[in-house]
């Protein structure tokens, strides 16, 4: 499966000057919503991701995703795995579990995102699940931006990665883009202003 080509064909592989959720800057951005707007394609991708997870014989009860980006991927993965799905969301900049969702003590979860960059949002969701008595057994995403180690791709962990080293991450592919702090961003130095994806229709 050529994940990069799928993103390009869907108009989801964007080039410009972007402010990522991590606060870093990048010349490229992956708009997974453009990929997941096609239900058949979303099902195909998450069916494949479910097969990868199953091949590692990871036992889990439920899937949790951080809103908003992770919801479609997480829901489709839960469907493919015949598991329950819940999501966390930000309220006043703090990740929370709302809407009557509950976590049973000892319930095993995979945290699913659309894209994993450093893994910060996924880790926030994981900490909420653990605080309620749940157990995190792994992480999953359609794609990894090259910072976190990916179990099924045998890709190494880099310094910016925030996901725990003792838990596996499963993805369909790696996109290795450079990301920059604002202070050393070459695009900023050229006078360009970073745009938060979604703020201008992207």
From Swiss-Prot:
It catalyses: orotidine 5'-phosphate + diphosphate = orotate + 5-phospho-alpha-D-ribose 1-diphosphate. 5-phospho-alpha-D-ribose 1-diphosphate binds at residues 93, 113-121. The keyword Transferase applies. InterPro entries: OPRT (IPR023031), Orotate_PRibTrfase_bac (IPR006273), PRibTrfase_dom (IPR000836), PRTase-like (IPR029057). CDD domains: PRTases_typeI. Its cofactor is Mg(2+). Orotate binds at residues 117, 145. Pathway: Pyrimidine metabolism; UMP biosynthesis via de novo pathway; UMP from orotate: step 1/2. It comes from the Bacteria. Keywords: Glycosyltransferase, Magnesium, Pyrimidine biosynthesis, Transferase. GO terms for biological process: 'de novo' UMP biosynthetic process; pyrimidine nucleobase biosynthetic process. The keyword Transferase applies. One of its GO terms (molecular function) is magnesium ion binding. Its EC number is 2.4.2.10. NCBIfam families: pyrE_Therm. Homodimer. Catalyzes the transfer of a ribosyl phosphate group from 5-phosphoribose 1-diphosphate to orotate, leading to the formation of orotidine monophosphate (OMP). PANTHER family: OROTATE PHOSPHORIBOSYLTRANSFERASE, URIDINE 5'-MONOPHOSPHATE SYNTHASE. Belongs to the purine/pyrimidine phosphoribosyltransferase family. PyrE subfamily. This is Orotate phosphoribosyltransferase.
């Amino acid at each position: 499966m050529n994940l990069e080509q799928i993103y390009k064909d869907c108009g989801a592989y964007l080039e410009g000057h972007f402010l990522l959720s991590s606060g870093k800057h990048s010349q490229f951005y992956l708009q997974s919503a453009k990929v997941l707007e096609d239900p058949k394609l979303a099902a195909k991708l998450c069916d494949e991701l479910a097969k990868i997870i199953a091949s590692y014989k990871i036992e889990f009860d439920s899937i949790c995703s951080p809103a908003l980006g992770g919801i479609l991927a997480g829901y489709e993965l839960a469907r493919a795995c015949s598991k329950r799905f819940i999501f966390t969301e930000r309220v006043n900049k703090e990740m929370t579990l709302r809407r009557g969702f509950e976590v049973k003590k000892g319930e095993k979860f995979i945290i699913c995102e659309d894209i994993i960059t450093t893994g910060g949002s996924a880790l926030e969701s994981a900490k909420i699940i653990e605080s309620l008595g749940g157990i995190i057994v792994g992480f999953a995403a359609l794609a990894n931006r090259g910072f976190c180690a990916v179990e099924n791709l045998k890709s190494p962990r880099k310094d910016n990665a925030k996901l725990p080293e003792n838990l596996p991450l499963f993805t369909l592919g790696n996109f290795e883009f450079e990301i920059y702090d604002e202070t050393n961003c070459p695009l900023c130095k050229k006078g360009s202003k970073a745009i938060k994806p979604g703020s201008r229709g992207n």
